[in-house]
């Protein structure tokens, strides 16, 4: 597949992806994940409590918060804390991250604990939510390993891996892992969350300029499968170091 992309990448190529573990010293799990120029810090914090609706049920909870630094984009944005209200986009993304990560955890095996994934965007160049999910999974694994090292778990609650990638139709061609110039000028934009068994966890797709057809959707999903397979390899390599 050949298409002229601003980055010069092939249509089925990811941006350079790096996952640096133990990026901060306080959280049970922390990573700096980069998808090209998109940089996200993901930390996993463990608390010995659960939300009210789960009390005394013997289950844990996985949740997430997401935010962007004021100058993570081309122009400065006011902090949401200063406005006193989270934007709808922020709420949507942090709920997505939480939903995605809950699918890879046996919450009964976790016990009555909450693991919160805080995903903070240092620099945005497209794909911040997919980078956040991919990095947050690694931070979650490190948090679980920390609990195991403390002797606080009878067995690992992890039941699979999760990663996410964007795909889209840019200049008439399906492409993988859109950066900002592509994302802002594409015909179709889609975020795909998958597990390492080939299952789809969430699909978020929108026709930005013109409708897409079933055949194009199939090509986008095939690209997403290829991309997440590469991301699972990167996650495994990071966790083996």
Curated annotation (Swiss-Prot):
Enzyme Commission identifier(s): 2.7.7.56
UniProt-recorded Gene Ontology molecular function terms: 3'-5'-RNA exonuclease activity; tRNA binding; tRNA nucleotidyltransferase activity
Residue sites binding phosphate per the record: 89, 127-129
CDD domains: RNase_PH_bact
Catalytic reactions of this protein: tRNA(n+1) + phosphate = tRNA(n) + a ribonucleoside 5'-diphosphate
Similarity annotation: Belongs to the RNase PH family.
Record-given protein name: Ribonuclease PH
